[in-house]
Amino acid sequence: SKPMDIVFLSNGETGAEENWEHLQRITKNIPNRVVRVDGVDGRIQAYHASAEASETPWAFTVFAKLKVSPKFDFNWQPDRMQQPKHYIFEAKNPVNGLVYGHQAMIAYNKELTLANYGYGLDFTLDDEHASVPLLSGIAQYNTDEFSTWRTAFREVIKLLVDDTEISKKRLEAWLNEAN
């Protein structure tokens, strides 16, 4: 299969330039096409612009707050025999130590992304999705007090709504670690 595009999505985040330059360095010797979508206001509009920038049916979407692991395997491919879905990789949270899909790289399916207008609580989780236990990098959301609070607030709301044991354990870590 053709290597999937890599789309770096940014909109003025602290650390975006450093993470973009880092991504360019670690991908310079691989065949994947790497593009940047920058400055699109609105979450849904940014996701749509990122899908439109991709020339492959799925694309690795790297959010500006993620410092991508140089060990991430960009040869990874989605299971094309299954129903189309988004694939959520893992990221390490430097504040509470959790490792799961929060702030991680996502392999977005282009058609699903363009058909989603964000009517639910979470754009990615509104469509079919699967977790992939591959570490994509370190989430660097804790750059200032407001960004840290806003990111934590959004994630805690999602965890509160998802009444599963794993979400309850993650919620406890968010509420108790590093406070």
Please annotate each region the language model reported.
Residues 8, 63-65, 90:
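Active-site ExK catalytic segment of metal-dependent nucleases
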Residues 1, 75-179:
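Catalytic-site signature of metal-activated, phosphate-bearing donor transferases
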Residues 71-73:
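Acidic donor-diphosphate engagement hotspot in glycosyltransferases and nucleotidyltransferases
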Residues 1-53:
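N-terminal anchoring/stem segment of glycosyltransferases
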Residues 31-35, 58, 121:
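Secondary-structure boundary/capping signal
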Residues 50, 57-69:
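Short beta-strand-to-loop acidic/aromatic patch adjacent to the donor-nucleotide binding site
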Residues 11-16, 66-69, 93-96, 112-115:
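Short acidic, S/G/P-rich loop/turn micro-motifs used as interaction or catalytic elements
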